[in-house]
């Protein structure tokens, strides 16, 4: 009986060790913005709870209560299942108590009404640059450029920098090559100018000979 118990215990232990452990959710890139869309940050999160923590740290919200909605349509993000079903680089909007999601068009209309009271200041174009990292190991990261014309038409473009270290290395190499080429050109130009000045000085007559010609010409006139 004792031998049977020992064997069954070893089998159970082996089965428990052979079971694969649940994989942790991978880090996903996303971005967060404020209700007025004036601030936009890029972060990496594993879950919805992790997103709340990093939003609080990134936007320095301390203990202020907030909730998250999708920036494109205002859908509330409340469950982990719905969060995991979203695509990468999704933009979340942070709303506080009393704030409501508004589409960009309504915000542009309010912006134009506010400008109507101040006709002396009209923004023709506004360009914002948002530099963020999708991977913490990236050297430069990603650049989001957003241009707004007359507060109505907006265009945004995401530039994902791949191989940033290689790009920087090539840029430094070309900068070094340009500086060397410029140095050689300046050195060659200075040598040419020096030779030109020396040749000009050789063609001019000496001052002593020019002075001696004056008394000779006077004697001939006498």
Swiss-Prot record:
PROSITE patterns: CIDE_N (PS51135). This is Lipid transferase CIDEC. Residues 26-103 form the CIDE-N domain. Ubiquitinated and targeted to proteasomal degradation, resulting in a short half-life (about 15 minutes in 3T3-L1 cells). Protein stability depends on triaclyglycerol synthesis, fatty acid availability and lipid droplet formation. Lipid transferase specifically expressed in white adipose tissue, which promotes unilocular lipid droplet formation by mediating lipid droplet fusion. Lipid droplet fusion promotes their enlargement, restricting lipolysis and favoring lipid storage. Localizes on the lipid droplet surface, at focal contact sites between lipid droplets, and mediates atypical lipid droplet fusion by undergoing liquid-liquid phase separation (LLPS) and promoting directional net neutral lipid transfer from the smaller to larger lipid droplets. The CIDE-N domain is involved in homodimerization which is crucial for its function in promoting lipid exchange and transfer. The keyword Signal does not apply.
